Each structure stands twice: as structure tokens, then as C-alpha cells.
């Protein structure tokens, strides 16, 4: 639309394609949300954490994960139950903020997209997920509340250490 209506306007798609916040694993996942855009490359250095990247956390391991990494819990709506003893906010309210670790309570459309990224996530769900994913400086984790556990391509299941 913008290119059509403003014929003399040039769109800069190179200046903002570097992230100083996120490690490459997080950039790679975020890039898949907008495949027609120039991919973002990481220049971020997450520090000396051993827990860098993107993970899947089984719902019965959430308490252990919260204790281990103290992530900010990100959810789509205040109606989603979370552990009130840890920081929590809605996806949209996190925009512009940086957090070490985030734990995302995914909606059904988000979980479906994670399992099969060949179909675009629609509208606000895509924008909100992009914001949620890109808040993390070190790690992003998604809660898997399925009974049998799901397998998601290129996202390992986090296993608590004994």
C-alpha cells in the first residue's frame, strides 16, 4: 500500500535487520514469522548463560523452569492463569522491553504455527508473537500443555536437571 500510494518513498529494509538483543536462535524463529522481510541477524552477546535459545517446556515442568530461570511470563490475555509469584505481562505490554528469559503461554493458533510453519500465523497473533519472542536477551520458552507432549521442529524440549 505505502509503495503504491507514495511512489517517491523509499523503504529502508537494511538498517533494522540487526539485533543487539537476541541470540541467533531467537532471531531465526522471529524471522520465520515474516519470511518476506529481510532476515534479522544477531549481534547480541547473551553473556555466560548455559541456557541460550528457544525451548519447549512441558506444563508439569513449569514450576521448576520458573525457579531455575525466573523468566517473565508472557500471555495473550489476563484470563490465562499464570504463577502470580513471578513477573507476568501480556504480550503487547512487553513491547519495547528487554528481559533475560521469557516463558510464553501460547494460544492455540501460536502452537499450531510452531508445529507447522508452512502456513502464516494471521494478523494480531503474528505481531504479538513477534513482540513476545523478541523481548528475550537469552532464552524463550513455550509451554506445551498437551497430554502426550508435542514435537516441534528445531525446538528442543527443556529437561530439568536432576
Q: Model segments located where?
A:
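Conserved helicase motor core of SF1/SF2 NTP-dependent helicases
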Residues: 1-68, 72-131, 135-162
Amino acid at each position: 500500500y505505502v509503495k503504491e500510494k507514495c511512489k517517491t518513498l523509499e523503504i529502508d529494509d537494511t538498517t533494522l535487520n540487526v539485533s543487539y538483543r537476541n541470540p541467533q536462535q531467537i532471531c531465526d524463529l522471529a524471522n520465520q514469522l515474516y519470511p518476506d522481510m529481510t532476515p534479522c541477524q544477531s549481534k547480541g552477546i547473551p553473556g555466560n548463560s548455559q541456557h541460550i535459545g528457544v525451548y519447549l517446556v512441558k506444563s508439569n515442568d513449569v514450576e521448576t523452569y520458573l525457579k531455575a530461570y525466573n523468566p517473565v511470563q508472557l500471555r495473550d490475555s489476563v484470563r490465562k492463569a499464570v504463577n502470580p509469584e513471578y513477573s507476568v505481562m501480556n504480550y503487547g505490554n512487553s513491547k519495547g522491553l528487554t528481559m533475560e528469559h521469557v516463558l510464553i503461554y501460547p494460544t492455540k493458533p501460536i502452537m499450531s504455527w510452531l508445529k507447522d510453519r508452512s502456513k502464516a500465523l494471521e494478523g494480531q497473533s503474528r505481531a504479538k508473537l513477534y513482540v513476545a519472542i523478541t523481548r528475550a536477551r537469552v532464552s524463550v520458552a513455550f509451554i506445551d500443555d498437551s497430554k502426550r507432549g508435542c514435537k516441534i521442529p528445531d525446538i528442543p524440549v527443556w529437561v530439568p536437571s536432576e
